[in-house]
Amino acid sequence: MSRSRIVVADDNHDAADSLAQLLDLMGYDAVAVYDGEQAVRACHDLHPDLAILDVQMPLLDGCAAARQIRDEEDGRAPLLASLTALKLQDEPLSSGRDLFDTHLSKPLRIDELSSLLARTTAVPR
């Protein structure tokens, strides 16, 4: 049986790689990418159960990537979680907050991540 797939997108390579490694250790099949365009491609190619998108990324920010993922996947988009140090009322998140199913704050706390994973269909197998 295959493991649930998660895409982690953050322009901070260390942060993306660390989170993907943690998710792998937790039993998920996690892939790290480093900008919004890569996130859109990964979601299109890999059909993940969950995508965790940093809001402020180069080339295509997290909100624009979420919009494109939703448009391209036509109802089959993964659960989308924003990951940001911004407050919800801050730009650019406020204009795109409805694009995400949930929001995570930086620095990411393990209990928040565990809660998100428990609420998703992304279950380790």
Residue ranges of model-derived segments:
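Two-component/phosphorelay signaling modules centered on CheY-like receiver
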Residues: 13-31
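Acidic catalytic/metal-coordinating carboxylates
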Residues: 34-38, 61-65
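Active-site beta3 strand of CheY-like receiver
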Residues: 46-52
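Receiver (REC) domain active-site loop signature in two-component systems and cognate sites
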Residues: 57
